C-alpha cells in the first residue's frame, strides 16, 4: 500500500492539491477527472487509494465529497520512504 503514491497521476493530484484554490476548498472527483483528462471512475480510484493511505482526507459539501491533502501524513510517508521502507 505504501507504493500507492508513486503513481504519476496520484503524485500530480497531490501536487495540484497544494495550489491555493484546491488547498483551501478541496476538490471533487469530477474536478480531478476534468483537470487530468481521465474518466471519473479512474479519478475516484486514485482518490480512494490516496485516502486509504491517509494522504487525503474528505469532507462533505452540498452532498459532494471533497478531497483535501493531509500534509502531516504525507510528510510521515515521505520519511518512511527516505528510511527505505
Per-segment meaning from a language model:
Residues 34, 51-52:
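Alpha-helical residues within the helix-turn-helix
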Amino acid at each position: 500500500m505504501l507504493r500507492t503514491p508513486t503513481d504519476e497521476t496520484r503524485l500530480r493530484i497531490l501536487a495540484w492539491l497544494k495550489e491555493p484554490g484546491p488547498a483551501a476548498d478541496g476538490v471533487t472527483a469530477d474536478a480531478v477527472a476534468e483537470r487530468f483528462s481521465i474518466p471519473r471512475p479512474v479519478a475516484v480510484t486514485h482518490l480512494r487509494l490516496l485516502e486509504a493511505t491517509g494522504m487525503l482526507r474528505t469532507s462533505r459539501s452540498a452532498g459532494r465529497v471533497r478531497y483535501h491533502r493531509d500534509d502531516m501524513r504525507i510528510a510521515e510517508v515521505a520519511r518512511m520512504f527516505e528510511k527505505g521502507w
